[in-house]
Amino acid sequence: MTVKEELTSSEIANLWTAYIDNSAMSIKLKYVLHIMEDTEILPIVQKTNQLSENNLIQFNQIFDKEKYSAPIGFTDSDVHLAAPRLYSDSFFLVFLQNKMDMNLNAYSMGLSHSTRSDIRNFFQQSLAASIEIFKEATDLMLEKGIYVRPPYIPTPKTVDMTERQNFLTGWLGKRRPLTAIEIDQLFFNISRNALGHALLLGYSQVAKLKEVREHMRRGADIAKKHIHLFSSILLEEDIPAPMLWASKIEDTSVSPFSDKLLMFEVTGTTQAGVGYYGRSLASAQRRDLGAQYLKVLTDSILYGEDGGNITIKNAWLEEPPQAINFRKKVKG
């Protein structure tokens, strides 16, 4: 007799999260496909949309098989195809490349945290597809001259071992130059914040509710503050920093998306940012860098909490699957 292998809590968590994320992406790409004019970028958008659509089909098959209620996610009511262009085509290319970067983290975790072979296969296939789209988007950005390369530093000719405690010095005493690892983290934190700054500025123009517009504007200000902070650290050592994307935003007040979708995307991006900052904090070996990452982490966590309160207040937040509350059962 074959015993049915139930989904583990980790598998449920990653499937549930990925379902809502793919649902949001599928709806957003309907608008992008509608307004996309660049014939070189269009195939990448189509391939990304196909990935989201295929994933949603597989999610529903898994949930039906397990007799598990699928999340609501997002529907056609969350997109306004007649809305005018909000961002340039090149901005959407950068956005999709960044989204695939986030997929690499999410799907690799889904793969490594899954036990059942069918769930592992699903995340493996989604990861492979995301890698291909990421590569294609990056190659096209390079061709179009909009990919900003990380800074170059001299290639090391010898291997040195750290022998002095001042390697960790940051506030007092003579500071050592930034390591390649620290430059990498600073550079990509600036790049992600530059994209987020433009995204939030655009959303602050078109969101319907005042509290959502104000939340977007505040997020744009936080992103700009973080950009200036990280850029100043690089520029202090004559290392170039990436530029902002604000010039890619169009002048419109008509939103292509519901406030619910806007808040979901910004909340998800903020959560990802907290994860990136945590990784940067762990890799920072100069004390001043660690202190700065703690500050920006606090900014992001508090901002994310405020965003969560807005989504709860407006009944936009679906509750993730939860464990049984045995204490409540006993009291009942």
Predicted regions: what they are:
Residues 10-15, 39-51, 92, 117-131, ...:
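Alpha-helical scaffold segments that form or flank carboxylate-/histidine-based iron centers
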Residues 311-332:
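Acidic, low-complexity, intrinsically disordered peripheral segments
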